[in-house]
Amino acid sequence: EITKGLQNRHISLWQSHGKYYKNDKGEWGWQRPRLFCTTEDLFTQSFILPYVIPMLENAGANVYTPRERDTQKNEVIVDNDTRNGSIYLEMKSRKARWEKTDGYGFAQRKPVYEDGENPFLTGSARFTRTEKKKNKAFAEWIPTIPETGSYAVYVSYQTLPNSVSDAKYLVFHKGGVTEFKVNQRIGGGTWVYLGTFEFDKGSNDYGMVVLSNESSENGVICADAVRFGGGMGNISRGTVSGLPRYLEGARYSA
């Protein structure tokens, strides 16, 4: 545990501008001019993503980027509403069972979204009460990875009146198991980045995310979708950009 530095600090950081849809021209374009064989939209993130953000995170900070940070073109979303070839599982305990929340949750109902549509308002989310003992109730997201490689892992949930600040997530990947404690009192209804890990192609028991109801607090944990990989842009403004999502502007990312 980091006891000094940026521990428990939250930082919002834009890596650069990104491509956007120009209404006056009816086409996608960069927000900054081309200069010396590049553009600021591309050049700035070439050092923000691999160097500056990891430096801040290694100092203890939680870094939120309104733009996509993962350069992985593939994307897999595992959700309780739409499985899409992957697996979502729930295990209840003697004292805790999974239930549907009263509010909206994420659901991937379509491959392309029009301006103003929000997939976090088209599905449902799940919740259960917390327990202080280990290995009680849990939820599992097991993706079918299309190609061996590096994938960012994002979780989503709803922030509820009695959400806890230490929801326990376990990411199983090629390098082992990494544990995270997520404050579900904030960040509901969007993608919360955990980390980037190596995964093998296919569906594997060493390639998944687990949410446990073990907590030091009395309250509830919430489970919604988990996303693996940055993916391709899927917001249509006249048409989709045809680019990986990390090259698009913040408007087109959650």
Summary of predicted features, one role per range:
Residues 174-203:
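Extracellular carbohydrate recognition and processing domains
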Residues 159-178:
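Short, surface-exposed beta-strand/strand-loop-strand elements in extracellular ectodomains
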Residues 23-47:
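Glycine- and acidic-residue-enriched helix-capping/strand-helix junction motifs
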Residues 1-29, 229-253:
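Non-catalytic propeptide/linker segments at domain boundaries
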Residues 72-135, 234-249:
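Glycan-recognition and processing domains
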